[in-house]
Amino acid sequence: MEEGMNILHDFGIQSTRYLQVNYQDSQDWFILVSVIADLRNAFYVLFPIWFHLKETVGINLLWVAVVGDWFNLVFKWILFGQRPYWWVLDTDYYSNSSVPIIKQFPVTCETGPGSPSGHAMGAAGVYYVMVTSTLAIFRGKKKPTYGFRCLNVILWLGFWAVQLNVCLSRIYLAAHFPHQVVAGVLSGIAVAETFSHIRGIYNASLRKYCLITIFLFGFALGFYLLLKGLGVDLLWTLEKAKRWCERPEWVHLDTTPFASLFKNLGTLLGLGLALNSSMYRKSCKGELSKLLPFRFACIVASLVLLHLFDSLKPPSQVELIFYILSFCKSATVPFASVSLIPYCLARILGQTHKKSL
C-alpha cells in the first residue's frame, strides 16, 4: 500500500516539476487561478451576485459551498493526504537518488491534509451549480432550441476549462497531487448534483438552520475527538507545514481544518438568520425587490461592502479567539448581503420615492 502511494506521489512530484520547468511564464496565471478558485470568492463575490439575480440559485450555491467544504474536511481527516511541498522533502523515497527540486509560492503552504483538493472540490461544486442553473433559466419548460444547444456546449466547455486550470494550478503550486485534484472535482460535482434534488433548503426555518449548524459542528468535533482518542493526531499536517515551508510567513492559520469549519458554519448560520429576519421580508419580498435597478444596487453595494469587510483579518495569536471571530465574520457576510444591505437600500429608496410624490 505504502509503495503504491509512493509511486503515485512520485508521479505527482514529476508532474509538478514538469509544469514548473516548462511553464515558468505561466506562474502568475496559475497563482491567479488558485486565488480566484478559493472558496472565499464564492461567499464574497458569487453569492451576492447570484442571490440578487436569482434567489434560489444563490441559496443553492451557498449550501453546496458550505456542505461541500464540510465533507472535504471529513474526507481529509479520513484519507490523511500528503501535500507535494512537504512530502518531497520529508520522504525517504529518494534516498538513493537526488531529491527533485520543487518551488514553493506564497499560496503553497496550506496547513490541512491534501486529499481531496478543497480548491478543486469547491470550484467544481460552485461552477456546476452556476452552469446547471443558467441552463435551467434559459431553457424553461420549452423544447430546446438550436441557440440553447449552443449555449449548453459553450457553458460546459467553459466549466471543464475552469476545472482543468484549477487542477493544473494546484499541481503547479505544489499544493496537491494529481489524484487529489481529480478526487476534488468528482466530489464537488457529486455534492452539487445531490443538492439539485433537495428542495427543503429554500424555505428552511431558523430552527432548522441552527440544528444543521449544531449537527455539522457536533459531528466534526465528535469525529475529531474519537480519532484523537484512538491516538490519531489530526493536526499532524500543521507540524509538516511549519517544518518544510520555505518561509514561516507563508504558513497561514486560516487554512487549518478547524478554521475552515468555523468559517463555513458561520456562513450557514448567517444565511439562516438573514432569510428568517424581518429586514429580509420587508426588503427582498416587497415590490421594490422586483425592480432590476434595485437588484443591481444591492449587488454593487454588497460587493463593495464585503470587499472592505474581507480586508479585516481576525488576530491569530490565540487560536480560540481566531476561530470565534472567524465564525462571527463569516456569519456577517450573508446576513449583510441578504438582509442588511437590501433593507437599508429599500428604506433610502422608499423615502426618496415618497418625497418625489
From Swiss-Prot:
SMART domains: acidPPc (SM00014)
SUPFAM superfamilies named in the record: Acid phosphatase/Vanadium-dependent haloperoxidase
GO BP term, example: triglyceride metabolic process
Membrane-spanning ranges: 29-49, 61-81, 118-138, 148-168, 180-202, 212-232, 255-275, 292-312, 321-341
Matches recorded under CDD domains: PAP2_glucose_6_phosphatase (cd03381)
Full protein name: Glucose-6-phosphatase catalytic subunit 1
Cytoplasmic topology ranges: 50-60, 139-147, 203-211, 276-291, 342-357
Catalytic activity, EC: 3.1.3.9
Active-site residues annotated for this sequence: H119, H176
Annotated positions binding substrate: R83, R170
Sequence similarity: Belongs to the glucose-6-phosphatase family.
Residues with glycosylation annotation: N96
Tissue expression: Liver and kidney.
Example GO molecular function: glucose-6-phosphatase activity
Consequences of knocking out this gene: Deficient mice display hypoglycaemia, growth retardation, hepatomegaly, kidney enlargement, hyperlipidaemia, and hyperuricaemia.
Keywords of this entry: Endoplasmic reticulum, Gluconeogenesis, Glycoprotein, Hydrolase, Membrane, Transmembrane, Transmembrane helix
Signal peptide: none
Lipid bilayer topology: Multi-pass membrane protein
UniProt key word Transmembrane helix: yes
Motif Prevents secretion from ER boundaries: 354-357
Residue ranges that the UniProt entry lists as topological domain Lumenal: 1-28, 82-117, 169-179, 233-254, 313-320
Functional pathway: Carbohydrate biosynthesis; gluconeogenesis
Catalysed reactions, semicolon-separated: D-glucose 6-phosphate + H2O = D-glucose + phosphate
Compartments it resides in: Endoplasmic reticulum membrane
Purpose: Hydrolyzes glucose-6-phosphate to glucose in the endoplasmic reticulum. Forms with the glucose-6-phosphate transporter (SLC37A4/G6PT) the complex responsible for glucose production in the terminal step of glycogenolysis and gluconeogenesis. Hence, it is the key enzyme in homeostatic regulation of blood glucose levels.
